């Protein structure tokens, strides 16, 4: 893609350009935000580094691409919410205007490079602006380990003390310290290169937890040279230092030195540029313990001998959630009109319950023919328009199921927050992770959904995790053979999201497979992940065991991007907030759903219940399988109406529809051991 690089002059924005080039993107312009008062170096902007802005004009000459700049005033960070929405007179709107101007002048602009490492504040703002302009964010440094990243930067940097004697080093990366504001750093460090600073920063990190890449504002840098500076570099002439208490600044005096750097040198440096492997070291160990499955076994036919009975839309309140399930339409023939009917019905339900759309936490989308995904997704996106209803769209699982009735193109179910409903544009009680930029970290969202959502006032932080498939994050292409690796990658992405948000306790898990031949690989992958790797690899020693039984495996018709497996589910940060022994007996005795099942003495195979408790308030998350229609009907009838059931079933089974159940038609379903069952249940109470 053709991209503009947002640059501050610092190491991160330029090092990200390096990775954009590594991933075959084309740099066509530079963009910069600077202080309106030209003599002012530091605006204390929440968003932009402005120290050293007076050198920015040189970079256009060094690289040979146009530079676009726009000024901002001091104290214009008017919207400091983590998840940004367009706000009049905020400094971010200057970035919007800058990029809009560039896009008008360069219509084939496709992407924006940004050097964010840990700052969600910066990331969400750039993503908001780019989303409004139809641009892709390229943020290859996002969530990188800082010590590892600094080591790579130093590896690619020149030896400033030996440039004359090292011809291979002379044109490499060169970033200098221009500001320090941390314990252990002072004016003597100003002007130092990254390799000179690395041991200092490592020591300060061990002693005082100083961020090695300066993500806490400990230091700022200015780049003088890089392998893609093909037309010139900045020669350091002098360093003018000044101090204000514990903050020390340097104004660099430089001279532009023209040169014609061969493209072969850049290509050589790109070849040497370290890139994170697709699998983390621990996940690489896991793949090596699995037998490799190279390809699918062949086309599988699904015979549609099913009931055309259509479950009614159900609305069920469980604790602080409203479950709106089985939204379908048969009023219209086209997929677009059916989709519009569904979202009209959903809008009416929300309106009648006085619930804004920004309170939708999670969505499950079944599509009969995945070739219609684009049409449905367009209407879905319009319904959840972030510019109207605020940031953090619902998490989502989207799969193809030919088990829907022949004249039904799509089915939608949603989970809605019913606490603190109001007319605010932003649901401030809604937390989430919505990463839209490409990186090495995990896939960006490929639709209008968040990777995860939760409620901020939930002490357990019960979180809804979007379905994850085996996409290579930096390219957003599906991983090829062996298929085992694609399955492991999908689960790694799920685990990465859980680790990032700190919600690693698994409550309910679903794995969708589009080809039954991968069933054994999925089972082994799940077993190794949950506990078996602890005994096989030191890299897994710190991981707590997960409960295998919470998994329901379902065979469906198709997955996005032709994937063979997708992992999604519900997790939480902590199972018990007030761990009080005196309360445990009371919790067990008041376990309504479990008590019902015990009294019924039913043969629910693989039954597993996880109780989440906070301040005497209990929630149950139950997984189970049933092979008797009579026992299923008894369960559906006797389960308290305050509980929400998701029923996985093949529609050829004739069942009675109930009013507190989300029906999920699938071809086949299995437990965590791979045993096939007639019915699978996920129950929340």
From Swiss-Prot:
Pathway: Protein modification; peptidyl-diphthamide biosynthesis
Effect on the protein upon substituting residue 220 to A/H: Completely inactivates the enzyme. Resistance to sordarin
UniProt catalytic activity: diphthine-[translation elongation factor 2] + NH4(+) + ATP = diphthamide-[translation elongation factor 2] + AMP + diphosphate + H(+)
The UniProt record lists the keyword ATP-binding: yes
Compartments reported by the entry: Cytoplasm
Gene Ontology CC: cytoplasm
Observed phenotype of the null mutant: Resistance to sordarin.
A GO molecular function held by the record: ATP binding
InterPro entries: Diphthami_syn_dom, DPH6/MJ0570, Rossmann-like_a/b/a_fold, RutC-like_sf, YjgF/YER057c/UK114
UniProt superkingdom: Eukaryota
EC number: 6.3.1.14
Group of enzyme by EC: ligase
One Pfam family this sequence matches: Ribonuc_L-PSP
GO annotation (BP), single: protein histidyl modification to diphthamide
Keywords from the UniProt entry: ATP-binding, Cytoplasm, Ligase, Nucleotide-binding
Subunit structure: Interacts with elongation factor 2 (eEF-2; EFT1 or EFT2).
Miscellaneous section: Present with 2270 molecules/cell in log phase SD medium.
Family under the similarity heading: In the C-terminal section; belongs to the RutC family. In the N-terminal section; belongs to the Diphthine--ammonia ligase family.
Its biological purpose: Amidase that catalyzes the last step of diphthamide biosynthesis using ammonium and ATP. Diphthamide biosynthesis consists in the conversion of an L-histidine residue in the translation elongation factor eEF-2 (EFT1 or EFT2) to diphthamide.
UniProt-recorded name of the protein: Diphthine--ammonia ligase
